[in-house]
Amino acid sequence: MIDLDLRAYFDTVRHHLLLEKVARRINDDEVMRLLKLMLTTSGKQGVPQGGVISPLLSNLYLTEVDRMLERAKETTRNGKYTYVEYARFADDLVVLIDAHPRNAWLLGAVNKRLREEFAKLQVEINEEKSRIVDLDRAESFGFLGFDFRRLRSMERQVWRAHYTPKMKKRTALLRKLKDVFRRYQSQPVDRVVQLINPVLRGWVNYFAVGHSSECFSFIKDWVEKKIRRHMGRARNRRGFGWKRWSRRWLYEELQLFKGYRVRRASAPKALPA
């Protein structure tokens, strides 16, 4: 599997190349004029991050890469089986190559063509963070905030994709929540709950697929302890107040976020090598 990292992608998008791509699809001078004005706010190159249209433009800029990968996929197809698969959103790209020895040439060929396409678009590959991943050796790769790996199910002994939130994403969430508890340590607990609930809801809703249950349990327990410690300090009490404040009280009376349910996605089976 090819896991590519693009160096400062959003800051290096070439405006003239992007506008050429947009012009092939939109025949409206006013729209093109407004788009040029929007792009120039970020300087001579790059796409302004945070804008409503920025994800669309970032995806559009790399459509030639998608076309190349689609051609590779169809050229090497054998009936219903494909030996090249890929997934991309903006600058996050992973390419999976069939691991059978007879397809070993594909890895080098696709890797070479990818680099050629990125060079045409003047997009630089971050060699330090790009790598070839061997899923047969239980190695993992990251995509859109998740860690993916290939595991065999214990019940049916079938290979399946296993994906969980990346550790750095969990760490970033806890750091953000810690900051709320620190800055509002003298405030009533219901105020703290009002502030952390939207943060938890947004994060959990995004990661509520795959195999996030263990991660969610850790976060849920961590938040409960922080809430208990907050209330204990307000009353000059030590400990976490397990007897004073039941779990039911935290969720029913305080209305602490409790929607940690994981949606089971129907992930495709991973074919054996």
Where are these regions (language model features)?
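Alpha-helix N-cap/helix-start motif at coil-to-helix transitions, marked by capping-box chemistry
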Residues: D29, R33, L60-T63, T164-T171, ...
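Short, solvent-exposed helix-loop connector elements
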Residues: Q45-Q49, H162, K178-V192, G202-C215, ...
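Conserved polymerase palm-domain catalytic core
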Residues: M1-L135, S140
